[in-house]
Amino acid sequence: MVLAGMQSGRAIAADFTPDNSDAIIRWNNATLEAISSSKIAPTSSARAIALTSTSMYDAWAAYDPTAIGTQLGDSLQIAAPNVTQQNKETAVSYAAYRTLSNLFPTHQNLFDSVMSDLGYDTTFTTTDLTASINAQTEAAITGNLTAKALLDYRANDGSNQQSNYAGTLNYQPVNTWDNINDPERWQPISIDGGGTIQENLTPHWNQVTPFALSSADQYLPAPPEPFLDADGNLNQGFVNQSLEVIKYSAELTDREKVIAEYWADGPKTVLPPGHWQIFGQYVSQRDNLSLDDNVKLFFGLGNAVFDASISSWDAKVHYDYARPISTIRYLAGNNLLPTSDPNVRINADGKTEIFAWGGPEQGSQWILGTDWLPYQDITFLTPPFAEYVSGHSTFSAAAAEVLLQYTGSDDFGLCHVEPAGSSTFESNTPGVPVELCWDTFTAAADEAGLSRLYGGIHFKDGDINGRAMGREIGDTVWAKSQYYINGGKVPTSVPEPASILGLFVGAAWMTKQRMSA
């Protein structure tokens, strides 16, 4: 069993054992371990995954007769006699080690331990290829050099890594934790009466340089539902999306609770971008992929979640849209929810009550609408950034698209069993073991998006439009990764997906042919 993350001390797992003998998988797991034990945002975790997988790809590209690196192009070309499995492993390991040491300096012992297990000298830091005395030192230098080139390029990419990814745009919320000035806009939440108030997480992320996107807003979706319609009246679409979340909350089954919790990927987990790296590891094992195969797979997969982070955060910052916890409480507090809905009523005091999940171990019951809680860990009620679009949906759809393109099929075939009573959101849930199975990558991505409605975190539009964005992003990243892998033969300027279906199919076919050659 491989850990897909830690949440409140409990492992959320995908039920298979990864092959840590493969260098790419080994370093992918080291990346996920660092993420799960760090206080890190989904955005910066996606960047860490992308940089690590890209640095390994760049080192590997020097050993491939066709592929070119993302930073040094084809200027590094190792002589054929030195192109061995051992030397490739050395090169990608040094590249990953240098990259991760830069990204997670407080986890140096973890990365040193991996290098020690692999038998590599961490003090060998030279980037001068003329200093190589044999093929093994040449490989180590290649890894050091390609990692340095990538890190130098990314040092000023807009992420603000040097200041722990702190926001750089002086974002100020329109609403306060205890007062809503604009019901459409994001509200910071406090779970302790104002003692600790959410701060918007990485609101500058749309300033980060993407891997494949032409701009952060390349796939910006249409606006979400406004509070008022064109005539200045309450927009029923705004109300209806909140009623839909209330309905999900009222009717939560154990299976839906498991789905909400399995996909939550909150603090102390590998987060949503890391979840799909675990799925990539499963595909690697399922298809018996080699190091050459894995480096190409994770190159695309890592950059898919990275560009998804930039694009989804651009939408979040652009629209600054409210979360369900804010809209439901606001509409209820102002008696704006219709009593014609079976889950809404006015009590004897003239206040709006809703029939919904009442909190841990409370089941569904009539509660004041202003007290409504999403089905989440009580210490992490709702994420500290805007609703629209769903990051989960965007990350998942982008990753699923790359996995589909890489394998040439949507077939997935992974299952996970959640034991009875394993929930950390409430005790005795689920009452019996619940098995989650995903026949296709698309089904897994769709469930990840839907889980956010079960959990009361997102509205349907945020999910559906996030999925649509994710698929476009996945296609764009796939094409860009093939450009590098195929030696610059795939266009970097990607047209509309419908017009390049043949390109994607052809690129997938070429990749499969090279894998089987």
PLM features per residue range, with description:
Residues V2-A11:
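C-terminal segment of classical bacterial N-terminal signal peptides
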Residues I12-P491:
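Acidic/polar surface patches and capping/hinge elements
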Residues R514-A517:
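Short, charged juxtamembrane terminal tails flanking transmembrane helices
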